[in-house]
Amino acid sequence: GAGVGARYDDHQIAIFWLPELYDLILAVDNYCPISGVNIIARGIVGDIEGEPVVASPLYKKHFSLNDGRCLEQPEHQLRTYAVRLIDDELQVAARTDEDVAA
């Protein structure tokens, strides 16, 4: 599962395809709130207790790719994005607070 950075509106997002774990495409902010750098797309992708995560490359903090929360420091969070692949087009939409709560 490799990540790729992309522009979305006025900021960067990190998109991950996880065929070996879940056959999912997931997207979160590329900006790491701990390091202050757009670097999440270069993080190491894995699984912690069944949850897909990305480890920030600088401080190795794990962020859930499902809901964006930092597992070690819950006060830090990444925004998550709804992603779908239609034919050969990747469609991305920002999630609302209601989407995350559901």
Language-model features, listed with the residues they occupy:
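N-terminal pre-ligand scaffold of iron-sulfur
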Residues: 1-51, 64-65, 77-102
